[in-house]
Amino acid sequence: MLNIRKLSANADGFKAELEALLAWETVSNDSVNEIVKDVLKNVRERGDEALLEYTAKFDRLTLAKGSDLEIPKSELEAALKRIPKDQRDGLELSAQRVKDYHEKQVMKSWSYTEDDGTFLGQQVTCLDRVGLYVPGGKAAYPSSVIMNAIPAKVAGVPELIMVVPTPDGEVNDMVLAAAAICGVDRVFTLGGAQAVAALAYGTETVPPVDKVVGPGNIFVATAKREVFGTVGIDMIAGPSEILVYCDGKTNPDWIAMDLFSQAEHDEDAQSILVTQDAEFAEKVYLSMNKLVKTLPREEIITKAITDRGAIIVVDNEDQAIELINYIAPEHLELSIDEPKALLPKIKHAGAIFMGRFTAEALGDYCAGPNHVLPTSRTARFSSPLGVYDFQKRSSLIMCSAEGANMLGQVAGVLADGEGLQAHAASARYRVKD
């Protein structure tokens, strides 16, 4: 039988148990930090030469020169033709739905003119070049290409550079096909911290980017953290999470499989069921034990459920909402009768899946909203990846003579108060005598 925590929100010591459940070690440690810093320094100083060495060492792929790291566009198109029609159709439908959704996120420039003629506004522009990291090998995820590339392209980013490791020369056709569909401009066979370094600093072959996005292992996550400041990054993602709040009226098999959909990602993933119905909680537990045996990732799921899973019984809806907002889950399912009525009370969640028919997996692939979401309680202060992550804002100010006269007097007084005489003088030069 699966050994999952069964908790009552009213029990003594519940808060301590909850904190232990949610605790997650940082994405890095001293050993990883040292390795990553060495890789970053090496790539920054030696460029393509270092990339070729690391590719041979870690991916067992020997290439003669830097230009061999690039996968030609013709290969992307060939991969698109090679994959089965149902996969191609699925990728294209997913890309279109993600595009349709993200087009509604585009920020627009705006401005207004005050009575004295002073012009104020905000100009929105896109990033020039973005780097997309995609995990490679047999565990490659073409959905990651779609979710990261489409918002960048919708934002208007003119150049999107993708890096994907190809261990032993193994290329994942679905990943390359997704890159072709999404309009990725250049693809390099690079992985690990060295790929992040190449994107951040540039080499003779790989152009430097303005922002690095995309998931990766502990070395990739640590490298992204290290290069932040030189370039922007999307986020440092922790293990995948799902919290299902159910009123007891949904098929327990559905809920069990929804919990497994995140647990199968890796052994550190977290799956939590919150319900007011203790009998239903037990039904879900029985379903979990029945269904886990049917899945090829049974071992991973069992470890994740044992180490970080929980079934939590609450007294009422208000207690459930308080718990949800405290946990701030990456994925939240509201498997209840009137989920929309609960929305005003839900403050912290990466994505909210409403109703009994909305499996979280639909959001992972093709619903439309982005599947790159804040984890480890960071939904308290951060948001899903979107078009706005590939746009930036510039403030616009143009003073009329009359406006400069009025504002100059105010700025002069404030600058004097801060002891900044050059500021005060600069403002007052524009003041009429």
UniProtKB/Swiss-Prot annotation:
Residues the record marks as active site: 330 (proton acceptor), 331 (proton acceptor)
* Cofactor(s) required, per the database record: Zn(2+)
EC number(s) per entry: 1.1.1.23
User: Which residues bind substrate per the record?
Assistant: 240, 262, 265, 331, 364, 418, 423
Coiled-coil regions, chain positions: none
Q: Which UniProt keywords apply?
A: Amino-acid biosynthesis, Histidine biosynthesis, Metal-binding, NAD, Oxidoreductase, Zinc
Q: Which InterPro entries match?
A: Ald_DH/histidinol_DH (IPR016161), Histidinol_DH_CS (IPR001692), Histidinol_DH_monofunct (IPR022695), Hstdl_DH (IPR012131)
One of the protein's GO biological processes? L-histidine biosynthetic process
Pathway in which this enzyme or protein is active: Amino-acid biosynthesis; L-histidine biosynthesis; L-histidine from 5-phospho-alpha-D-ribose 1-diphosphate: step 9/9
Per UniProt, Zn(2+) binds at 262, 265, 364, 423
Catalytic reactions of this protein: L-histidinol + 2 NAD(+) + H2O = L-histidine + 2 NADH + 3 H(+)
Q: Which GO terms describe its molecular function?
A: histidinol dehydrogenase activity; NAD binding; zinc ion binding
| CDD domains in the record | Histidinol_dh (cd06572)
- Tell me which domain of life the UniProt entry assigns to the organism this sequence originates from: Bacteria
Please give the GO cellular component terms listed in this UniProt entry: cytosol
**Cofactor notes:** Binds 1 zinc ion per subunit.
Free-text function comment from the UniProt entry: Catalyzes the sequential NAD-dependent oxidations of L-histidinol to L-histidinaldehyde and then to L-histidine.
List the HAMAP family hit by this protein, alphabetically: HisD
| Family, as annotated | Belongs to the histidinol dehydrogenase family.
The protein's name? Histidinol dehydrogenase
The source organism is Hydrogenovibrio crunogenus (strain DSM 25203 / XCL-2) (Thiomicrospira crunogena)
